[in-house]
Amino acid sequence: MSVTTEARPVPRLKQRYREEIAPALREEFSYGNVMQIPGVVKVVVNMGVGDAARDAKLIDGATRDLAAITGQKPAVRRAKKSIAQFKLREGQPIGAKVTLRGDRMWEFLDRLVTIALPRIRDFRGLSPKQFDGAGNYTFGVIEQSIFHEIDIDRIDRVRGMDITVVTTATNDDEGRALLRALGFPFRES
């Protein structure tokens, strides 16, 4: 009995990063060491559902949507403190979060850049100013229907989400150059 191990296909964006983007970044910033080249560590997709404090069923829709978009089961985030003004008790579910790494991360970024972002109405590009000073980029998406995995007829309510791309870049310029090379459509400011 022989066992054949079929190699899994390498995600398209990951292959492009290895073959084209990393060498171009090394040349642009003249790095002496290969490990200095900025790369993507993880992508965190967070969906805050503040209304879940009043209706706990709303969190189910958010987790279903996030699971469909990312291909991974989301972690339900719970309130750390009770806040009387918001009618919030400690331990109540108020959001859902997914952390993507490895091949799932590369495939999600590829779908985000090539399919989802162009589907946003009146989209003029992402703001190039939303970097955190350490090369990481966070932006918000107003509705989940831009992802083709979501069936528009089955949406119970429009939910937005925050997407954070964590990189190994040491400053914003390196992070911006990396994400621009990966295909992120930054608007000219």
From Swiss-Prot:
* Function, as annotated: This is one of the proteins that bind and probably mediate the attachment of the 5S RNA into the large ribosomal subunit, where it forms part of the central protuberance. In the 70S ribosome it contacts protein S13 of the 30S subunit (bridge B1b), connecting the 2 subunits; this bridge is implicated in subunit movement. Contacts the P site tRNA; the 5S rRNA and some of its associated proteins might help stabilize positioning of ribosome-bound tRNAs.
Pfam families assigned to the protein according to its UniProt record, in alphabetical order: Ribosomal_L5, Ribosomal_L5_C
What InterPro entries does UniProt report for this protein, alphabetically?
Ribosomal_uL5, Ribosomal_uL5_bac-type, Ribosomal_uL5_C, Ribosomal_uL5_dom_sf, Ribosomal_uL5_N
Record's protein name:
Large ribosomal subunit protein uL5
Superkingdom of source: Bacteria
Its Gene Ontology biological processes? translation
User: What one GO molecular function would you report for this record?
Assistant: rRNA binding
SUPFAM superfamilies xrefs? RL5-like
Q: What's in the keyword line of the UniProt record?
A: Ribonucleoprotein, Ribosomal protein, RNA-binding, rRNA-binding, tRNA-binding
The entry's family comment says: Belongs to the universal ribosomal protein uL5 family.
State how it assembles: Part of the 50S ribosomal subunit; part of the 5S rRNA/L5/L18/L25 subcomplex. Contacts the 5S rRNA and the P site tRNA. Forms a bridge to the 30S subunit in the 70S ribosome.
What GO CC terms are in its UniProt record?
A: ribonucleoprotein complex; ribosome
Q: Which organism is it from?
A: Parafrankia sp. (strain EAN1pec)
